[in-house]
């Protein structure tokens, strides 16, 4: 597939799905539809599991074995792409074990120095992100893999979700965030754009998609696990 065709396909697909909430694991609580508005309701902090990793060597903080198990599953399950209910259950169990085993270094934390970072997706249960990773995987003929990132700056109160496709095109959803307590972060989308790479070189603005919250249920120096207002789980590693 040449660059022009890849750009056009990405643009077409994202425009068709522009009402899809593309924030890996931070979307409105209602899962049956992808509407902008969020119905007000109680938001219990239920644990719906997730995982982590894509690279070896992240073994400090909390139980090394529990963390390694999460990272291994994340890699085996290809970041969650095409995962089965059984895969999800296995990952959830591994994450629960990680949370239960966490030591002082793996406590949930929204501290600025801990949360502020560029985080690369290791595993997610969030369907919209997985759709993009499956539709445009990259990694063919020497091309890089499509990657997803969460870029957080607590001091400036911003969060950016970004999917970078194999040809350099990226899809970005920007949000403002507020730290609610030592675990929970609320967010509201402010803007979204599809930035096409060469030879198209164009930016297609898209509407923002609502608001929600996520809980950081595990954080250490190189990995973070979050569970959100839609019941999804996200595992990211520090980039």
Question: Where are these predicted regions, by residue range?
Answer:
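Generic detector of short, well-ordered, non-transmembrane alpha-helical segments enriched
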Residues: 18, 46-48, 115, 220
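N-terminal mitochondrial targeting presequences
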Residues: 22-28, 47-60
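A short, compositionally biased N-terminal segment around positions ~18-40 that is enriched
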Residues: 39-48, 89-93
